[in-house]
Curated annotation (Swiss-Prot):
Assembly description: F-type ATPases have 2 components, F(1) - the catalytic core - and F(0) - the membrane proton channel. F(1) has five subunits: alpha(3), beta(3), gamma(1), delta(1), epsilon(1). F(0) has three main subunits: a(1), b(2) and c(10-14). The alpha and beta chains form an alternating ring which encloses part of the gamma chain. F(1) is attached to F(0) by a central stalk formed by the gamma and epsilon chains, while a peripheral stalk is formed by the delta and b chains.
Name of the molecule in the record: ATP synthase subunit b
Function, in words: F(1)F(0) ATP synthase produces ATP from ADP in the presence of a proton or sodium gradient. F-type ATPases consist of two structural domains, F(1) containing the extramembraneous catalytic core and F(0) containing the membrane proton channel, linked together by a central stalk and a peripheral stalk. During catalysis, ATP synthesis in the catalytic domain of F(1) is coupled via a rotary mechanism of the central stalk subunits to proton translocation.
GO function terms (MF aspect): proton-transporting ATP synthase activity, rotational mechanism; proton-transporting ATPase activity, rotational mechanism
Disulfide bond among keywords: no
Keyword Metal-binding in annotation: no
Amino acid sequence: MDITFTIFAQSIAFAALIWIVATKIWPPLIKVIEERQQKIAEGLAAADLGQKELAQAQEEIKKTLKNAREKANEIIEQAHARAHQIIEAAKAEAITETNRQQNLAQVEIEAAAKRAREELRKHVSILAVNGAEKLLKREIDVNTHKMLLDELAAEI
């Protein structure tokens, strides 16, 4: 065998092998590689999308927490304002009640003083009549007595 023939035969066998690989093996292999590349690309896109969604979710969580804090602070401020209103209303009510009780006590004191004065006047008038009676050694009639007492009470 001649070396040229061997090289020629090997070249034909190699060309046949290249043709078989290029027509029968290479297209399905390329197809599988492309499918794998597409799956990897889809996976990377899904991962990117997941990262974006995660970032959006975290932003929404931050906004929600911020809103919740603001709402809580607002509720606390309203509660403090309401407590202040209740305290002020209670103070005003206590002052009103104190004034009312003071007025009632003042009226009661004045009424008691008036009763005591009237009683004292009656007692003084009786003592005065008894003293005058003893001095004059005679009795004064009731009408004259009443008239004198009324004049005396008016002067007092």
